[in-house]
């Protein structure tokens, strides 16, 4: 019985660690896209990224949720171009998770 309890606890710790690593990887990938691939930082201010763009909205102030970021990145808005076709759906999701997680924090 003790061995089964140990196995169960170990399994949950392993899953928690794996999920945390995956979340950190997604944030790192999203930040890289924000800074280097889509170069969102040239227009947007986001403290976590160290960006101070003055053209687009200050993302720390508006604190957009993931869906809002995804729709805006996919379709563009105002002078911001659409990135659907430029970024993969996985990249759009990663940058959306990154921005919605760190904005205003």
What residue ranges belong to the model's regions?
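C-type cytochrome heme c attachment motif
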Residues: 35-45, 78-81, 93-97
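Short, solvent-exposed loop/turn segments at secondary-structure boundaries
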Residues: 56, 84-85
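Electrostatic cytochrome c docking/interface patches
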Residues: 16-35, 68
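N-terminal export/targeting leaders of redox proteins
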Residues: 1-24, 105
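Gly/Gly-Pro-rich "capping" loops immediately C-terminal to redox-active cysteine motifs
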Residues: 31-32, 41-77
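C-terminal capping alpha-helices of c-type cytochrome domains
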Residues: 86-105
